[in-house]
Regions:
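A recurrent flexible, glycine/aromatic-enriched loop bordering the glycosyltransferase active site
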Residues: 44-51, 65-87
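Short, well-ordered alpha-helical scaffold segment located
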Residues: 89, 93-94
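Conserved nucleotide-sugar donor-binding catalytic segment
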Residues: 96-102
Length: 173
C-alpha cells in the first residue's frame, strides 16, 4: 500500500496514516483508493479554511456541469467532501496505474487518474482527523505564479485537461 499526505500539516497525528490505509488494507472491504477529508476550521475556531475548495473548485465543477452538461467525471469530483485534501491511500494496482502531477493540480489530477483507471465502487472517503490545520498560502491576487492564484490556475488546468481528454471541446470564449 501507498499513503500520501501533505508535508505542511501543523496538527499531524500518526493515526491519520492508519485511518487512510485501513479501508484499503482491510482484506474484505474491496477498496483500492481512499481519499481523506476533515473539518476545515482554524484551530481557534474563528476562521473557516479550505478557501480554494469552497470558493473555486466547488463552483467551477457546478458551472462546468451547467455549461457542458452533466458528466460522470464532474459528478465524481463533486462527490468528494474535500477534493483538494492532500491525504490519500492506494493499493499497488492504483499506484502503478496512475500518473501523479507535480504541481498544485496534484490532488485533482490524482482523482482524475483514479477515475480514468478504476471503478468508483473501489473508492472511499475517510474522515482522517478531528482537528486539522496546515500552513496557509497567501492569495497573491496580482501574481499568477504564487500563492492561491497559482494553485487555482494549476487546478483549473488539471480539470480542463481531463475534460478535453474525455471529448469536451473547450474554446477561448
Amino acid at each position: 500500500w501507498v499513503a500520501l499526505h501533505d508535508a505542511d500539516i501543523i496538527t499531524y497525528d500518526r493515526s491519520m496514516v492508519a485511518r487512510l490505509l485501513y479501508p484499503v488494507a482491510h482484506p474484505t472491504f474491496g477498496y483500492a483508493f481512499s481519499k481523506g477529508y476533515y473539518y476545515r476550521a482554524s484551530l481557534d475556531g474563528g476562521r473557516l479554511n479550505g478557501r480554494v475548495t469552497r470558493l473555486f473548485v466547488a463552483p467551477l465543477v457546478r458551472a462546468l456541469a451547467l455549461t457542458f452538461g452533466r458528466s460522470d467525471y464532474l459528478d465524481y469530483i463533486g462527490s468528494f467532501r474535500y477534493p483538494l485534501a492532500g491525504e490519500c491511500a492506494m493499493d499497488l494496482s492504483v499506484a502503478r496505474s496512475i500518473r501523479i502531477p507535480s504541481d498544485w493540480g496534484l490532488e485533482i489530477g490524482v482523482l482524475g487518474e483514479v477515475f480514468r483507471h478504476h471503478t468508483s465502487a473501489r473508492v472511499c472517503q475517510v474522515d482522517v482527523a478531528d482537528v486539522y490545520d496546515h500552513k496557509h498560502r497567501e492569495l497573491s491576487a496580482d501574481d499568477a505564479s504564487a500563492g492561491l492564484h497559482k494553485m487555482s490556475v494549476d487546478i483549473a488546468k488539471a480539470v480542463f485537461r481531463k475534460m478535453a481528454i474525455s471529448g469536451v471541446v473547450l474554446t477561448p470564449e
